[in-house]
Amino acid sequence: MDDFRKQIDSIDQNIIENLSRRTEIVLKIGEIKKQDKNAVYHPAREIEIFNRIEEINKNSKFPSPVLIQIYREIISACRALEKRLCIGYFGPQATHTHQAAIHQFGSSCDFIAFRTVADVFKEVELGKVNYGVVPVENSTEGAVNHTLDMFITSSLHIYAEQYMPIHQYLLSVCPDLSSIKRIYSHPQALAQCRLWIENNLPHAELSETSSTSEAVKVCLWDKYSSAVAGRIASELHPEIKILAENIEDNPSNNTRFLVIARKDCAIRSANDKTSLLFAVKDQAGALSRVLNIFSQNNINLNKIESRPSRKKAWEYLFYVDVDGHRSDPHLREVFQAVEKETVFMKILGSYPKARITVEEIS
């Protein structure tokens, strides 16, 4: 056994030495970025690294999701040596958006919670934070209209995206499930766990709070209460215990989050997406003509969502996600054709498609 432990010690030393060498190279790249005035955060490059690491590790016994988490923190720590980023997110603290922000950027950043989606947009626009993280749609409840509406007037761009499964946990300072008398949470979270609560705590009193984070704060002083919240809440409050995991009624429920920035993500990846807003003329077949342009040019539409324009009654804007990067010559021609058929068109950004790997974040 001692011999095996010595081998492990030697391997650990090699890992640390290689991490140190990797860091030195990252800092050299950082100097080049600074000279060229390039951003330190490149989501396309990070996705490329994660995909390569996963491929290298495919025949290993070490779990790839854990390896990706480790590399996310390595990248975050190295990025912070170039420049420590400040990330604004739709709060409060310990919510799913907070968790999404950490998952996107790693923990070597400063995170600031804002009360509303509009506040996140405002602080990014003013340059008080480098990037913002906001929810844009949920697989069971549809679009987050507040976020879509902000893009109508905002000058910000979509820089990256992320999908995160929404898992709910029952948290409490009381270690005994049978002693729980009250359950606190946001009404949406309570609704997502209705069947589990009915089957496991049918006599518990349900109390609504302004957020899952607020629910956790309440149950810190209410001994025989519990909170429905995400795992991150238990990590931020060590005195809180997890009584039950994954208590949501729909295990496939997930939310899409956007990273917003003052500049577009100019660097292309091998698998990009472009988002745009447009309004069509008030005449029969106007929307159909626009959609036919995409169809005839073999451009796949990932999403289409309508929103009131707020300028004129019964006038609508359409939010669309399509495959490809805005710099693609073919897609540029398609957008030019679309613009001729619309009264308003705005490209919100081109960015790499998110890695859909639920195991990393569940």
Residue ranges with predicted function:
Residues 1-362:
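Domain-level signature for soluble enzymes in the chorismate/prephenate branch of the shikimate pathway
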